[in-house]
Amino acid sequence: MNYLLVDTCVLSDMMRQYNPCLPNAGFVEGVFLKKNMLRMINSVVQDMDGTSGYIVVSAFAFLELINKFSDIFKEEISKKIMSLNRIIATIQQPPSWMIIEETNLETAKEFCQVPNAIGTGEHISADDAVHIATALQRGDDITLLTTDHVLKQLNLQRISVVTD
């Protein structure tokens, strides 16, 4: 089973394109959705029998989208093609290929295991650390799809990182 955890930026591109009336429609490249990520995501989303895997999203990523909604989706809001209700509806009834992981005490415990910096000394932000902690709390091998190239240097068991 393939588990793909998306960060907030990748999730924002997915939400720009997601149509609940066509939940298995593939995504296209966007600002943050890059070629390799896209191939991996579409292999899950377009799998009609649901056996290839899941897109995992931390509840925290949705909180970030809601908190920064008017900045992240400024263009879509002006064109009236995105609303906060759409984000909330996705949280309340996610597509069959999406798992929304709670941010809870287990996340906090795993957060303590995330290093503050990578080997080069570059800092790992608290936001990124929450996404990493979410990946760790699952206990499965998981691929983190992120826009943060610093995380490509991360060396943690069970987590691989894709930035393109």
Identify what each model region corresponds to.
Residues 10-14, 67, 80-98, 103-111, ...:
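Anionic, Ser/Thr-rich low-complexity intrinsically disordered regions
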Residues 96-143:
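Active-site neighborhoods of divalent-metal-dependent phosphate/nucleic-acid chemistry enzymes
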Residues 1-60, 72-82:
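Short, well-structured N-terminal submotif of metal-dependent ribonuclease cores
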Residues 1-5, 18-30, 132-164:
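Acidic, PIN/NYN-like endoribonuclease modules and their adjacent C-terminal/linker elements
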Residues 50, 71-75, 93-97, 117-120:
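General structural signal for alpha-helix termini and helix-helix connectors
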Residues 66-70, 136:
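Short, amphipathic alpha-helical segments that act as regulatory/interfacial helices
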